[in-house]
Amino acid sequence: MIQCFDKGVFLNKGQLSATAALSAEQARENTMAWQILQAHNISGDPERQQVRFDAMVSHDITYVGIIQQAKASGMKEFPLPYALTNCHNSLCAVGGTINEDDHMFGLSAAKKYGGIYVPANQSVIHSYAREELAGCGKMILGSDSHTRYGALGTMAVGEGGPELAKQLLRNTWDVPMPKVVLVYLTGKPKKGVGPHDVAIALVKATFETGFVNNCVLEFCGPGIKDLPIDYRNGIDVMTTETTCLSSIWETDEVTEGFFKTHGRVEDYKPLHPGEVAWYDKYITIELDKVEPMIALPFHPSNAYTIKEFLANAEEILKGVEEDARRRFPKADPHLTDKIHDGGVWADQGVIAGCAGGLFDNIAEAADILRGKFTGSGAFSFDVYPTSVPVSLELMKLGATADLLESGAIIKPSFCGPCFGAGDVPANNGLSLRHTTRNFPNREGSKPGEGQFAGVCLMDARSIAATAANGGRITPATDLDYTPVHHEYHFDDTVYKNRVYYGFGKADPSVELQMGPNITDWPKMYQLSENLLVELAAVIHDPVTTTDELIPSGETSSYRSNPLRLAEFTLSRRVPEYVGRSKAVAQQEKARREGAVSDRLRQVLSRVGDADQLAGSTQFGSAVFANKPGDGSAREQAASCQKVLGGFANICYQFATKRYRSNCIHWGILPFTLDEGTPFDYESGDCVFVPHIRQAVEQGREDIPAKVICQDGSVHDLLLHVKGLTADEKEILLRGCLMNYYAARNKE
């Protein structure tokens, strides 16, 4: 079905080949990724990318912070099209006016700086970008990790907010030329197999080994031609879960048809690799052999075919329960009781967001459910189309009526089920979702209060088949139905009537509308000569997600108030983290004011003259995790640590480039350890890093440190900070990206 080959390959006239007339070095310049990147690279050095994007997108969890950063750094107008969507609208059951206050800030910013403002429930961020911004050969940057428009010929990248602030300040996205991995598609999917099935199988094959980490996936092969554009988009958006950097697909008449339908045929052009192209690795996918899939908690890679899962449900669900008990000691997870009456029964089905709520997915779900009923039991079925234009078309062709008659509920365009702000299941509920992620607590449960819910990812087709059986988990291939092909018609009337198009029309006289919850960033201090950090969280999970570092859902209500948001840092994984970090921050504040705490003096005395070191040693908190940063691009995963006085992450490997970049932009030192180095220390132990400022200035990558344990023992530890650019060094020295720009503006 899917095979990964950890060796280079030529694509020679569309065929895989071990040899070719060109050298690998010559042929690598014929990949689509190379061509698009070089067209946007202003460095003059193809190995050192300095990219300027064609457009940007942000949603309402992130755009306030980005605009505040750019404003504080001297921005006067948006220099490129920048769409502000409101699809993470939290509906604010808590917080009073703060949700709509953020939206009004966004509208006033679009008017002041010349942006595009998409009101709440008009579209989810990635649907709007596909419909209105993507174009063949373009590059788009988004402050959301699922910024992926490769199937439309657009290389798109999801990054933390500071990278978008840099673009607003007319600076560049700086990365070494990434490796390019060929994804070669053959065959045609069978009826009942949808894009999420292919995507989940791809994530399963690549995630655990990091096979495509920080690479560009380039989709080619004869299997593309039979895939509708929504099918391609549905696979493409999930490439984020492989931890790849970006993606790009060959384009054809199907792609051209998309742009014609959306009134933008000028944004289409054929994209193909050159006659001979070289790839660093390759993956083959036989689409005709893909089966309906299910991804169990707590990651899209924890996947099985649905048939395999059903045949081994008790064993698999017991494993999930054991994992949940280890992660959430206050919860009492029970999923094996879903096995009864000859099947496995779910409590909820959801089709939503940038992966699930696509027109074709919902239309085929309606085909499956036409004339059937979801039942009057516990099982519920909710459908969220990606945009109002998609909702209009579904209504016009009758799919909406079919779904409503079956017992489904049609909801507005909203990302809520994907980030814990909508359709939170009952305690010990089992939810089937065609959304992007099933990370711990991402569905909105609160394990600190004894709650647990399990989310399984499935394709819309199999969720609809399950709904037709009253919640009994069923692959769509088991049902006899006839999918009806519908020619999609895009009606942009609503966008023309409701979206504010302000690019190129900045009005400096407009005042930003600031609600009481919208606050400035607290002062951040430059890096001192020495650094002492107390371990406020030590996490030995294989991977730590950004959703664990800073939960989403109702927490996002405080997205525009750094101090209030920071109170939720690691709250669902290490509830003691905030208190520990704040205690350290208080001691650091006292130190700056000349009052050194007994605790700080005692720790410093283990590594030198405490009085002398106290004047030159910054004291902060740190997080240790094996592999932090998988998942969301939200910068808050790093900024909240810094607001609480965090100065370092220590790990064996960062899960994603974007999280490491977020740490650097907020002045958090991205320390790594050599694989195999034991780290048996506990929260409350301290790490002393002498001469850290000098080490960063000089670009030293091997940095000796001392661990001071609570029992008074001292141990050597070798830390690394590898591959910093000149700008990244300066950002760390200044304390954060905003300080860096403030200093540049004074020069």
Located regions from the model:
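Fe-S-dependent hydro-lyases/dehydratases of central metabolism
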Residues: 1-747
